[in-house]
Amino acid sequence: MKELYIGDIVNTHGIKGELRIISDFKYKDAIFKPNFILYVGKNREPLTIVSYRKHKNYDMVLFSGVNDINDALPYKGESVYINRDDLNIEGYINEDLIGLD
């Protein structure tokens, strides 16, 4: 898996298990959608997005299997990654060009 860092989970939101992600990733529309898999934390735990919405400057995500705030709390402070091969966009992203001559 060629992983790309996309942001950090900075907090929970509400009691239903929603997580608040801060990200400056350019192609958010390509990843923040239902059934897309994000990889969270040092162990890169795969979590499937159930729902997504914007709230202020945050990306609010609800994951499958995260049913309440107690399930969500362990993810607070963790980094979020994607598999580059799962990103379906035309052209290149900045991360593709790093290290090229």
Residue ranges and their predicted role:
Residues 1-101:
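Short Lys/Arg-rich amphipathic alpha-helical segments
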